[in-house]
């Protein structure tokens, strides 16, 4: 009887993001640009850490795994959302929905665990520097990462198998842009008590456990930093942990506000917007947050990119680029309003790494600024391209 009920539902309808009427093409261009920047930035970090011998250390090994997890995490939801926007057919099969749940939980939990491992790595490096080489040896580092992969794969599989046994009778509209676990539980006409019990026990342990590990690690780090006598050593310790703290705050802040502290007044649309922060924005910002103050990583990122530069070139920020692209970057830089130091650092970093990537980011920014403009999307995109390329 349960299988008969399940056979009634062969696909779900994803409502997607709450876009204004006539603005879907604009949102498509925006999220496509953000997704391309996410993939490019994270894969550059993986390439740099794999090819540069100076980056063969536990810290960069964990960072490369975090970048891989971010690429897969973003690719679990964003391509399907873009395909639905492009085809205007927001349908996902039952099997596709279960697959999306599995990989979403797998790579989301993997992000969570690797952030905890990176916090422990920073703790050993700052609080126990003399034993760092023996404690964080290559074998132990690899074992920690493999353990993270195995635990998250098993956890995601348990949730997916429990979801597969549920029945969905008539309701098949998912008020989200991807198959969210909690949303599907509300649509089921079966008893979901076992699913909710596993979410509370295992899900809570997999989320709160690594978070507590990060808090404990940074509590010891802060006490150790306060005892540093020199200002230079203090500044170096803070800069080493600052990027990781920024990523942790962004990742856990959005998840805690959405899942652990749900507001009764929050609408479904607001929940979808918050979900964009940890599915799209966090994987996008991770490579930039980790690279802004890391000279070794910046130099490693430049080396493989130089292989793609041919012909008559000149240097921009240490990276050789073609003259036409460099002129485009200079024109775009002159048109940007550098009102804050943070924005200035991000823009200079993009110019330093890849001017083409810089143009994509500026294009995304201008699309977001004109998000609610009444202009025709095709005309607006053409206007924005002209505005970026010509001073």
Protein language model features and the residues they cover:
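Transmembrane helical core of 7TM receptor-like proteins
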Residues: 1-355, 362-365, 371-381, 385-391
């Amino acid at each position: 009887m349960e299988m008969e009920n399940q056979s009634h539902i062969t696909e779900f309808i994803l409502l997607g993001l709450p876009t204004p009427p006539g603005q879907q093409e604009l949102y498509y261009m925006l999220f496509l640009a953000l997704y391309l920047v996410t993939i490019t930035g994270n894969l550059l970090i993986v390439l740099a850490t794999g090819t540069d011998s100076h980056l063969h250390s536990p810290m960069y090994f964990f960072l490369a795994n975090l970048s891989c997890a971010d690429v897969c995490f973003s690719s679990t939801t964003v391509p399907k959302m873009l395909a639905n926007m492009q085809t205007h057919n927001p349908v996902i099969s039952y099997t596709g929905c279960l697959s999306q749940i599995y990989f979403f939980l797998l790579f989301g939990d993997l992000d969570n665990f690797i952030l905890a491992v990176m916090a422990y790595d920073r703790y050993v490096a700052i609080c126990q520097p003399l034993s760092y080489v023996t404690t964080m040896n290559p074998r132990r580092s690899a074992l920690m990462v493999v353990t993270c992969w195995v635990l998250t794969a098993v956890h995601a599989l348990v949730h997916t198998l429990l979801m597969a046994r549920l029945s969905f009778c008539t309701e098949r509209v998912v008020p989200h842009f991807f198959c969210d676990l909690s949303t599907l539980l509300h649509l089921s006409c079966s008893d979901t008590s076992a699913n909710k019990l596993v979410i509370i026990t295992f899900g809570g342990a997999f989320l709160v456990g690594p978070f507590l590990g990060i808090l404990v690690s940074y509590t010891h780090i802060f006490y150790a930093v306060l005892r540093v006598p020199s200002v230079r050593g203090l500044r170096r310790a803070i800069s080493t942990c600052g990027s990781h703290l920024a990523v942790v705050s962004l990742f856990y802040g959005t998840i805690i506000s959405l899942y652990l502290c749900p507001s009764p007044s929050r609408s479904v649309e607001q929940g979808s917007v918050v979900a964009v922060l940890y599915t799209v924005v966090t994987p996008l910002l991770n490579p930039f947050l980790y690279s802004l103050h890391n000279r070794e990583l910046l130099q490693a990122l430049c080396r493989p990119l130089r292989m793609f530069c041919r012909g008559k070139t000149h240097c921009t920020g240490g990276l050789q680029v073609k003259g036409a692209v460099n002129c485009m970057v200079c024109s775009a830089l002159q048109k940007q309003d550098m009102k804050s130091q943070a924005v200035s650092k991000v823009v200079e970093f993009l110019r330093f790494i890849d001017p083409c990537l810089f143009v994509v980011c500026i294009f995304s920014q201008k699309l977001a600024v004109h998000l609610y403009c009444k202009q025709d999307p095709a005309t607006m995109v053409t206007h924005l391209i002209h505005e970026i390329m010509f001073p």
